[in-house]
Design a protein with these regions (language model features):
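SAM cofactor-binding core of SAM-dependent methyltransferases
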Residues: 1-37, 43-47, 53-55
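Class I S-adenosyl-L-methionine
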Residues: 26, 32-42, 51-194
């Protein structure tokens, strides 16, 4: 993924955990034996939890058929609770290793920000258009222990504007899921090295 590519570019070792994408450990994070690594092994930990169940867009399914059943608040709550387990596991891993820097990334509007275990964590808001030429803004929340990061929000003068609008948006068909989930290289480098 994006983080591994930047680490390789910086000539840093990286360890990845993912069920789907190629990874050092291709497994569910819930089953990952992170204690196989010494406590001082990681300088940086990055996690990008799944955002689908935390998305505001899930509300549009309420009262409608989804996956063969009427989607209800109860189903929505159950799905968010399942994803909470993943985020809590990531926080457990961060706490265990206590790296110099840790990062948890999710869209800015994600309901993850409203979960009790996230409310007290420090964060920055960034707009991907300020770190890439991908054509869309994608405001993103990055929780982190990094201090004094110079986060950039779109000033409508970024290189992704056509007139007063961004060239595209994430809702446009044609972008793959991998494209929607990627993190700009310039943002990662800024977070890791500045």
């Amino acid at each position: 993924g994006s983080i591994g590519k930047v680490c390789k570019m910086l000539d840093w070792n990286s360890v990845s955990v993912d069920m789907i994408l190629p990874a050092t450990h291709q497994c569910d994070i819930m089953n990952f034996d992170y204690k196989q690594y010494p406590k001082d092994y990681f300088d940086i930990i990055w996690t990008s939890p799944p955002c689908t169940n935390y998305s505001q867009l899930q509300d549009c399914w309420l009262g409608r058929m989804r996956k063969g059943v009427i989607y209800t608040r109860e189903i929505q709550k159950k799905e968010m609770n399942e994803d909470d387990r993943l985020v809590l596991k990531a926080l457990e891993i961060i706490k265990y290793f206590n790296p110099e820097y840790w990062f948890i990334e999710n869209p800015a509007s994600s309901k993850m920000k409203d979960r009790s275990f996230m409310k007290e964590l420090p964060f920055y808001l960034v707009d991907y258009c300020m770190y890439s030429d991908w054509g869309y803004r994608k405001r993103t929340r990055i929780w982190t222990n990094k201090k004094d990061f110079d986060n950039k929000l779109c000033d409508k003068k970024c290189r992704n504007m056509v007139g007063s609008r961004h060239k595209t948006n994430l809702g446009i068909y044609g972008l793959s899921q991998q494209d929607k989930y990627r993190v700009p290289e310039d943002l990662i480098i800024s977070l890791f090295t500045e």
